[in-house]
Amino acid sequence: MTSYNFEVTTITSLSKNKPQQAIVLCHGYGGDGRDISVLANNWQRFLPECIFLCPNAPEICAVNPQGYQWFDLTLDKEEVILEKSLIAEEKLNIFLDQVLDNFQLDPSNLALVGFSQGCMISIQIALKKKKQINC
């Protein structure tokens, strides 16, 4: 059993071999990993050696308590939103390192994608990565 710092919906690779790539899909504001995993179900046939991981964001959503948020967008102060996004970035970076370690992948075989707020956090992370990942 693989352990992560997030609750994760996982779509395993179609291949019986160890995954050669991993795609992390980050959901939008108020969503969850199950929502965005539908994309993985569609992409899987084109990427049979790939595992798809869809983490729930770290916070319960301020406007939808059934969903999650990477950081709170309802706050009025930009500096607080930035601070919260940096905390989410740190947590997601830990998760990405866990994925790379668990599947023994080179960062070039990891793609980070997202929808809405998930795209925001994905770009924020990918632009700062020392070892390049795909975004």
Task: Briefly describe each language-model feature range.
Residues 108-135:
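Primarily recognizes the serine-hydrolase "nucleophile elbow" in alpha/beta-hydrolase
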Residues 2-105, 109:
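Serine-hydrolase catalytic machinery in alpha/beta-hydrolase-like enzymes
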